[in-house]
A protein has these predicted regions:
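Acidic, metal-associated active-site segment
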Residues: 102-122, 134, 138
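Acidic, PIN/NYN-like endoribonuclease modules and their adjacent C-terminal/linker elements
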Residues: 2, 121, 127-160
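Short His-Asn-centered micro-motif
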Residues: 5, 43-44, 123-126
Length: 160
């Protein structure tokens, strides 16, 4: 199984998940193994979101930069998915006006398109809200499976 990680998953891991202790280190090792064998990926827009979020000299940004190869660019197939997705007015709401005005990255649609083309499961902390353009709603629109941070941590823990 391939997992596509949302920015909020990286931020939870990097900002809150301990780096020391046998059980914690095993989870970090499982994460790095998944990144190395390409079963854990993300998109370049997530990388850009985190580069904007963390200070240039932070340990978290250094960790991300050391794993830059996991942040994939969109393919032609994904671009076609995005084109069709954004024909729907409700889905256009997934890109917030403030992101457009401030030239800030917005990864949600790219994440779902990546998961769709890889037949992967998207991992996010966002919760489904009816009539919304949250990540779970975009997943529903494109018939993409998604799981929570807790579900993903359980999977990583079982691999360690």
């Amino acid at each position: 199984m391939v997992y596509v990680l949302d920015t909020n998953i990286f931020r939870k891991l990097l900002d809150h998940f301990p780096k020391k202790g046998k059980a914690f280190e095993a989870v970090w090792k499982a994460l790095d193994e998944g990144i190395a064998n390409k079963t854990i990926v993300s998109v370049d827009e997530c990388y850009n979101e985190m580069a904007n979020h963390y200070s240039p000299d932070s340990e978290n940004l250094k960790w991300i930069k050391c794993r830059k190869e996991m942040f994939l660019n969109p393919t032609n197939d994904e671009s076609l998915i995005l084109k069709e997705l954004f024909k729907k007015t409700k889905m256009q709401e997934s890109i917030h006006t403030k992101n457009i005005l401030n030239n800030r990255p917005s990864a949600d649609a790219y994440l779902v398109a990546k998961a769709k083309t890889l037949n992967a499961t998207l991992v996010t902390s966002e919760i489904y809200k009816p009539h919304s353009a949250q990540l779970p709603n975009i997943c529903e629109e494109l018939n993409v499976n998604y799981i929570s941070y807790d579900d993903f941590m359980e999977i990583l823990s079982s691999q360690s």
